[in-house]
Amino acid sequence: KDFIFEKTYECPVCYKEFKESKVKSSRARLIKQDRDLRNVYQGIDVNKYEVTSCPHCGYSALDKYFTGIAAPQAKLIKENISKTFTRFSRHTIVTYDEALERYKLSLANSIVKKAKDSEKAYTCLKMAWTVRGYMENYDRAADDYDEKMEELKLNEEELILNALEGFISA
């Protein structure tokens, strides 16, 4: 909780205001960097908080892309995401499952709004890093540990491959 603060946003698609949990960058202490440049911080996985999702219309994007949406893209989101979107519950402390659902929604939004390949690739990379964090923090005593690790490892590999292909085509 010491790492988290509430930030208020106005959705660029539906123009409604909402709050989102974000990481206080001054509180997160870097402890290592993986070979693929994923930063690992003590006490918090910042990747779980890098997607901003409007709980009203379903517009979702990585923080760096959230406000940069053109009117034709917003129209595509309203027509293809908002119509079928079901509100999700919001928690201050985001679980890995919640974070991955937000990443999936963010990737779907990127595809629908015809975002650049680099945006889709970066979303896949950040999602892969979140999956890796999930694997590192999953309860080893859980009954489904081996099955869950296999599932998550396959997801991470697929996301890394998608990110690589996206960056190459960008």
List PLM regions with ranges:
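Long, charged N-terminal interaction/targeting segments
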Residues: 1-3, 11, 124, 155, ...
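N-terminal cysteine/histidine-rich coordination modules
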Residues: 1-79
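Short coil/linker segments at helix-helix boundaries
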Residues: 32-42, 76, 80-86, 137-165
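Amphipathic alpha-helical segments of tetratricopeptide repeats
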Residues: 107-111, 129, 164-170
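Helix-turn-helix repeat elements of alpha-solenoid scaffolds
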Residues: 92-105, 156-168
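Short, solvent-exposed segments of well-ordered alpha helices
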Residues: 41-48, 90-93, 115-118, 150, ...
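A short, charged
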Residues: 54-56, 91-94
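Amphipathic alpha-helical repeat scaffolds of TPR domains
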Residues: 78-87, 94-107, 114-148
